[in-house]
Amino acid sequence: MAVKKQFANFAEMLAGSPKPVLVDFYATWCGPCQMMAPILEQVGSHLRQQIQVVKIDTDKYPAIATQYQIQSLPTLVLFKQGQPVHRMEGVQQAAQLIQQLQVFV
């Protein structure tokens, strides 16, 4: 389950997380991103003890999207100890996404 939080520094938030952080880079106008929302809820619930899910609206935070070279939406990036360790682009099925993430948690 994604939690709405304010943060002053994205990198500090990632580095300070005790769990790996799955970042969903999305936009409100993106149809495939809207398809991913319930899938991410399901994955977040299934892996809630192992990962934290964060959503970043690329229209509101273009500098973060540029920093991580986000060129297509949705893009999911798994960060561990502040560093990107896995990247997925496009709509993912819940079972496949869980299987991919479990390798890193």
Swiss-Prot record:
Disulfide bonds join 30-33. GO terms for cellular component: cytoplasm; cytosol. GO terms for molecular function: protein-disulfide reductase activity. It comes from the Bacteria. Gene3D superfamilies: Glutaredoxin. Belongs to the thioredoxin family. This is Thioredoxin-like protein slr0233.
